[in-house]
Amino acid sequence: GKMKEGVTATDLVLTIVHMLREKGVVGKFVEFYGDGLKNLSLADRATIANMAPEYGATCGFFAVDEETIKYLKLTSRDSDLINTVEKYNRIQGLWADDTCNYNDTVHLQLENVQASLAGPKRPQDRINLEKVNLNFKEFSKNKPVEKEIKNHNYKMQDGNVVIAAITSCTNTSNPDVLVAAGLVAKKACDLGLQAVSYTHLTLPTNREV
């Protein structure tokens, strides 16, 4: 299938983390395959594979295919290197093969993935975006906190956003996710919204992928 408009690779990987934590894949190699791969960019695949520690697997793997070669060309890799990558992976049996057999399979329909958040403590604690408000109230109802900050004219209470970060090697390597964050920020500015003084804003850069 294909993800709905507005749903990102981050939503997809949080769904996968939730599913695979329930399944139990500790110590296993997880390969992602199926018809839906043709609708996932290499950046989206990298987002999923890079979250292997979160879903507990030894590694998350996408077989090399034409999308991989397309990405190498897009990022101006040397043509000799690209040819070597394709030849090597075909010889080594790492090229995508629809005839492979697997010990176990978990099915996921991409069109069913919804916008979501995870937390507040564990990445597998996924909650649909539309239910975050109720979920937060339920989580914090028995934890009343209010603290006056010395030398400042505000009080802190449970639920205040004190850190707003677009971070991790997963998020900052995916251009679609960064563009989405930029569009949300622009819309907030257009509506006259801005972060309060005690919220720390950060956007660390990442290495070349």
What kind of region is each of these model predictions?
Residues 1-37, 50-51:
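Catalytic alpha/beta core of large soluble enzyme barrels
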Residues 5-7, 53-57, 171-189:
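Alpha-helical support elements that line or immediately flank enzyme active sites
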Residues 17, 131, 137-158, 186-196:
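Structural signature of cysteine-dependent C-C bond-forming condensing enzymes
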Residues 20-27, 55-60, 78-80, 185-197:
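Secondary-structure transition/capping motifs at alpha-helix termini
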Residues 31-35, 162-169:
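Short glycine-rich or small-residue beta-strand-to-loop segments that form or flank ligand, phosphate
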Residues 40-48, 53-136:
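Terminal amphipathic helices with adjacent charged low-complexity linkers/tails
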Residues 199-205:
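Conserved small/polar residues in nucleotide/adenosyl-binding loops
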